[in-house]
Amino acid sequence: MGVVSCGTTMLDQGVFENIGAVTWDTTAKTSGFTAVSGNGYFCNTTSSAFTVTLPSSPSAGDIVGIKDYANTADTNNITIGRNGSNIQGQAADFVINTEGRSVVLVYVDGTQGWKVTSSSQATDIVSPQFITATGGTVTCCGDFKIHTFTSPGTFCVSNAGNAEGSNSVSYMVVAGGGGGGGGEGVADPTAVTGGGGGAGGYREGKASTDCYTASPLNAPDGLPVSVQGYPITVGGGGSAGTSSPREGANGSASIFSSITSAGGGGTPGITGGTGGSGGGVRGACSAGNVGAGNTPPVSPPQGNPGGILTVTSSPYGAAGGGGATAAGGTNGPGGAAGTGGNGATTSISGSPTAYAGGGGGGDGFPGTTSGAGGTGGGGGGAPPYNGSTNTGGGGGGAPASPGTAGSGGSGIVIIRYKFQ
């Protein structure tokens, strides 16, 4: 007969543990028999259930192994007959009724009899499974796949993986930036100037299996996925203000699964707009109200407030829009405008990239210092620049003249996971 020996016990398919001297008979048994101490047996109950009878008059240290050969013990049980000795301290036979089960029994004494020292199933050994998905533009970075969505789409998961491989994804969801505010359109020190648009909300989560350098706004973990299609929404940037109307519009939200990033705040009048990051206050003779960021509130925060006015005398410089990691800058004397708040830098795409910078404010006439856009795609204030595409940057506010501002940059969604 074929044997597997050398003082080992087979627990499961190809797995061994050093627990006793067992020689495994590799010719499967198909009917009842009496076991011999020191042997292990593969029992095939495909045709019918049967009984394996333990040795009579055993001695301490005797050992027998039994393995369900064809994974049929759940329908055709393997009964281990006690042959006059106790099993697990009970005067009762032992039944293997679980598919793929293997057991090893060692005789201890007359009280406990045969004790089960090892028991396992084929399902106890779990092979790593990895997420498989499609959608967006797919690139690879080592053992990780990266799906980038710059427009609406669907992230389709066909295999959700498992804990031994991967079953959660890292994500970055950036909304569209707010539009910058328009200027009055006249070359006059008393002319109104436009505040910078707030950056789109920035949200990021890094899976525990991932290894890239995340931003300071990284959530504690990624998102688990299941086999389904996840609709992806990529928010557009808010439209720019002009000399009439001066109001810049809010950006639109970006969405992946349970993660929603709010559009950046625009510049609706004297008050900065609320949103993922708030819009900056326009330059005028009154201070106005701050544009709130992280609206609606989430943790970690998705953005910061827009800047306020610290100078309300002419020439009027405007405040900058908020960014992912910093509030918008305040204005200064002589028509100086506030800078946009800086965005967040992450390597989720495979290289360090900044996103969600606030737009700079427009400078007063005669202006000397316009507001620079925040790192991460924020538009500058002179001439007013648009927020960068697919960064969620806020649009730059317009100076007194000309009066047209920059529009907000569109958002982006990036999903990353271990695939091998």
Annotate each language-model stretch with its function:
Residues 1-49, 56-63, 67-420:
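Glycine-biased low-complexity/repetitive sequence motifs
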